[in-house]
Amino acid sequence: MIKKKQKNREKFWFSSCLFVPLQRKLLKMMMMRKFFFLIALFATTLQMGAQTFDDLPTPGGEEKVIDNTPDSIAKALMNRPAPGSTRKGTNPVLFLIGNSTMRNGTMGNGNNGQWGWGYFASDFFDGRKISVENQALGGMSTRNFYTDLWPAVRQALKPGDWVIVSIGHNDHADFFDAKRARGVIDGVAEDTLITGFNLRKQVNDTVYSYGHYLRCYIREIREAGANAILMSLMPRDAYDDRGLIIRKPQTQWAAYVAATEGVPFVDLNEISGSKLDSYSLWKKKYHFYGDKIHTSAFGARLNARSAAEGIYYSNHPQLKPLQELMVNVQWSMVNVDRSSGRPVVFICGDSTVKNDDKADHTGMWGWGSLAKTVFDTTKITVCNQAIPGRSTRKFLNDGRWERVYNSLQPGDFVLLQFGHNDIGNLTDKKARAVIASAEDTCHVYQIEDDGRYELIYSFGWYLKKFIDDVREKGATPILLSLTPRNEWPNGRIERRDDSYGRWYREVIAETGVDFVDIHNISADFLDKKFAGKDPEKCKQKAAVYFNHDHTHTSYKGAQMNAQSLAKGLRQSHHPLAGFLK
């Protein structure tokens, strides 16, 4: 039976949330547009019956373990760190309490393409001063984490430690069933409970409200001399009729408990939700993988950053000691001079775009280093961000793309030229090959060198990601075909129109991106000068445009490709042509 002593008690709690410290300017901009909407909805929210929470599907996988139930606690404990085992000397530990959205799978290693954000949380904390320990486990609710896993974590707590509690996706479930027995009562009332026989544990059991369990965590964290942080849940891949990410009702409940208990609250649901709302639908979708709740590495990284930003930019005085242990929260950006107010043309590519580029004009040269010879630098700033050995995948994974993306402003241009390093062994230690296709396809591979798992996408997919990101920032992407190689089958220079050329065309057809065919413009130039009956003689004559091998160019070859870019821009009457000399 459900017992309530103060039926109307919950109606008035949200006024307390007005005193929860708001985030600094960045977070204020994201949150305030939702704030008054939440106040208006609050009265009705509390009096709704059962909410539609996440009753997660049962995923498959090689592990043969059901990720959304605690049916393999023994196996999970072999992969989760023993509570407190990551502590270094007398340093504090930041414990993460959550479910599969924080730690996916019993191993949490991404072998199913899904990642929990807790895996990436340590990126934002100084490991010399604090350990980040992910104690989350798939399938846990606020209640059964507290009953099954929390006691061991509680014993490991020491004064000065920190605990983030962000849990609730699995709370709308049966109370006493044989398989899970993990449900909790909606809301925050302390005096609401239900009793029954727990078939999973074979004992009489009592179930309390969501708010009750949060208070239990807070009380016991304080008893240990540690610091509690309540955090709302990461958003789902679910949208309202305006196409915006649906916000979770637990946000209001956690905010109330935090306010009344006097602990910091970080609205992860809103911070990440606002970011996702600013993306294209295509981009929103690839932040999730396999279902509507679990995230890809993209989504997990986004949520880890949002959690870090929520802590770092909070004005809550209790968080100041933790803020002093944080790193990498500010966006990584390209150091480009904006003082003139001129637009910037960013160039992204590989060693054919940026190479040794020696002052004496010897050795290998990339054409991007000569872009200033074709652009009028009194009108536009040239920023060559290409780097040797990069493919689309590696340029992204190395963080090079993130710096360009974070630096973009409306009116900028981005030249994208990849291909030479993109096709090869997908799992070797170079970690740069992509699926040879332009389709939106991906697959999980295990990398041979270190055994890690990575969800690898197609050549076309990575290009489409770059294109979409550039447009999101109000800048203009321009796709460039790869430079030609010094190969002369049948006495004419090699054309790669049936592989890369086809993939470029498919990306163009799908995205409508602007395109300059440097490959064929430069190839036409070389054919006109050197084509003949003897392939070897053709190659020898053309060698003056190349250096070291058949791919990399000399200073003269780099000049040729830079001129091909300018020619292509003029032929297409592209707006960027207005910035040429």
Regions found by a protein language model. Give the residues of each.
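Bacterial Sec-dependent N-terminal signal peptides
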Residues: 1-7, 12-52
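Serine-esterase "nucleophile elbow" of acetyl-processing enzymes
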Residues: 52-136, 151-163, 179-188, 332-386, ...
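Short active-site-proximal "capping" loops at secondary-structure junctions
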Residues: 102, 137-142, 170, 353, ...
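Short, solvent-exposed loop/turn segments at secondary-structure boundaries
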Residues: 106-110, 241-245, 357-361, 395-396, ...
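Short, basic, glycine/proline-bearing loop/turn elements
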Residues: 134-139, 201-203, 350, 382-390, ...
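N-terminal post-signal-peptidase region of extra-cytosolic proteins
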Residues: 141-152, 391-403
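Alpha-helical cap/lid subdomain in secreted, periplasmic
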Residues: 152-297, 301, 308-323, 403-552, ...
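Acidic two-metal-ion nuclease catalytic site recognized across multiple nuclease folds
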Residues: 323-335, 580-581
